[in-house]
UniProtKB/Swiss-Prot annotation:
Domain of life of the source: Eukaryota
Tissue expression remark: Expressed by the venom gland.
A single cellular component GO annotation: extracellular region
Annotated compartments: Secreted
Protein name from the UniProt record: Peptide 9797
Keywords of this entry: Secreted
Taxon lineage: Eukaryota, Metazoa, Ecdysozoa, Arthropoda, Chelicerata
Organism: Tityus stigmurus
Length: 34
């Protein structure tokens, strides 16, 4: 489970380059809920 979360975090970090702060927060919350 931890490894999967790390992979998702890496993907999110790459996506943040194109996201605004609010969009990143919403995506992060969605990630945590899943």
């Amino acid at each position: 489970a931890e490894n999967r979360e790390r992979v998702m975090v890496q993907g999110e970090e790459e996506n943040t380059k194109e996201l605004t702060g609010i969009e990143f927060e919403n995506g992060f919350i969605s990630c945590m809920q899943n």
